[in-house]
Regions:
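Aromatic/His-enriched, Gly/Pro-containing loop or helix-boundary segments
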Residues: 63-66, 97-127, 134-137, 256-261, ...
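Histidine- and aromatic-rich segments of cupredoxin/plastocyanin-like copper-binding domains
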Residues: 99-100, 108-111, 182-323, 409-415, ...
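Active/binding-pocket-proximal capping segment
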Residues: 236-248, 390-419, 451-455, 463-465
């Protein structure tokens, strides 16, 4: 079937057949390790279209849902059957540094045909995910990601009322297939990142789910898009927020503004108690008209509970702002930005060398992972990073190994209670201060999670000793 690319965001529920979310499957080896294989697999991304060749974990994109309880040990044997070296990063987990999965900083990339064993304990309950962390712009963009759900010791919601929703956007060609030839476009690296023209949920095009009226559901939304910030409005179906980036709020809240911006790599847990006869949809709102990408049908009143269990806070150390050390981070570069004074691999970047190296962005004048750390903090020290975005583009900033609070943000309000996050969106020409206790020893990455931006220079690191 031939589809005009301009039609993708005009097509709504009528363009797809009703379906349910596919179950997740994974294989445990005899020694108790969960085996995750990076392999190519055929998968259909658009209704009635030919399959696309994706890079997957265990044959599907997203890969298997890993679901464990807080405090449990996770053991994963990663086997790389692709032609590129790879690794797995466990996004949002306050993990032992050696298990963080960052080539060049915490481990060597796993070469084709080789394997690596990850072994760690999950300290925090919540919604997390795992993904490739070598050439992420290419590997995540082709499908190397999956959900990691850490349940409370006594799960707040049973399996029927706890739904994981992995949201991705794909750039499809006119045949409805993944557009491989568009990967690595220089404009994506220097502008807003790679944006797709079709949305899937758990790898499925416009799924439809059934809920029972009057029962409480937890919807775990995970944005795995390379660069797209999803514009959502939970208030359209009376949803409340339970958690940001895996960290629960003291009580569910109603968003005081719309749209809610869910940037690349961020997660949000929604509380929904559907009403009889009131079907609703998750919609992306950035276009001229809402684009529904997941529909919920509400059936007869159920016999389950509408009671909302209280989610206990995770054991995060509170920043001591009075004793904090402040570290300025100036973000420069990108299209319509300034490039003066940027260095890459110790040499000044001119226009020609910038185009050849594809390094368009910089932190404090340095493009890409530098030899010298951004800062060193003593274990237990409170750190404030003051980020100044002197570019024309927003950025989804992610801190590895820690969660932080946004303490100050120029030009916009801070969410009530300064909720914990591991990724935040900083707007053009905006200054934002984040604070956290550097209590996890090791070398930790700080980067933009708009993956083309990270590849094009927006990566640095700090050390906790």
């Amino acid at each position: 079937m031939k589809i005009n690319r301009r039609d993708f965001f005009r097509l709504g529920a009528g363009a797809t057949a009703a379906t349910v979310l596919a179950p997740y499957h994974f294989a445990l080896a005899d020694d108790g390790f969960l085996e995750i294989r990076a392999v190519k697999a055929a998968q259909s991304l658009y209704p009635d279209s030919p399959t696309s060749t994706l890079w997957t974990y265990n044959g599907t994109a997203p890969g298997p849902e890993i679901r464990v309880k807080q405090g449990e040990r996770v053991r994963v044997r990663f086997i790389n059957e692709l032609e590129e070296p790879s690794s797995i990063h466990w996004h949002g987990i306050r993990i032992d540094n050696a298990m963080d999965g960052v080539p060049g900083l915490t481990q060597e990339a796993v070469r084709p045909g080789e394997r690596f064993e990850y072994d760690f304990v999950v300290p925090d309950a919540g919604t997390y995910w795992y993904h490739a962390h070598n050439k992420s712009w290419n590997q995540v963009g082709r499908g190397l990601y999956g959900p990691l759900i850490v349940e409370e010791p006594y799960p707040a919601f049973d399996a029927e009322h706890d739904m994981t929703l992995v949201i991705d956007d794909w750039l499809l060609n006119q045949n409805g297939q993944f557009d491989e030839g568009s990967m690595g476009m220089m404009m994506d690296w220097s502008h807003g990142g790679r944006l797709g023209n079709w949305i899937t949920v758990n790898g499925i095009s416009h799924p439809e789910l059934t809920l029972k009226a009057g029962e409480a559901y937890r919807l775990r939304l995970i944005n795995v898009c390379n660069a797209r910030t999803l514009e959502l409005d939970p208030n359209r179906f009376d949803a409340k927020i339970l958690a940001f980036d895996g960290q629960p709020l003291p009580a569910p809240i109603t968003m005081p503004y719309e749209p809610y911006l869910l940037s690349s790599a961020q997660r949000v847990d929604l509380l929904v108690i559907p009403k009889l006869g009131q079907d609703f949809a998750l919609e992306e709102l950035s276009g001229n008209s809402p684009f529904p990408f997941l529909t919920f049908h509400v059936t007869e009143t159920g016999s389950g509970s509408a009671m909302v269990p209280k989610l206990k806070p995770n054991p995060l150390a509170e920043p001591d702002l009075a004793k904090a050390t402040v570290h300025p981070l100036l973000i420069t570069g990108g299209a319509m930005g300034r490039f003066d004074g940027i260095t890459f691999e110790g040499k000044p970047l001119g226009r020609e060398s910038m185009m050849q190296s594809r390094q368009f962005w910089a932190f404090n004048g340095v493009a890409n992972l530098p030899e010298q750390q951004f800062f060193t903090a003593k274990r237990g020290e409170t750190v404030i990073i003051e980020m100044v975005n002197d570019t024309a583009w927003p950025h989804a900033m992610h801190v590895h190994g820690h969660h932080f609070r946004i303490e100050e943000r120029e030009g916009s309000t801070i969410d009530e209670g300064c909720p914990w996050k591991d990724t935040f969106l900083i707007g053009p020409s905006q200054t934002t201060k984040i604070a956290f206790v550097a209590d996890n020893p090791g070398k930790w990455l700080l980067h933009c999670h708009m993956l083309e931006h990270a590849a094009a220079g927006m990566t640095t690191w700090f050390e906790v000793v």
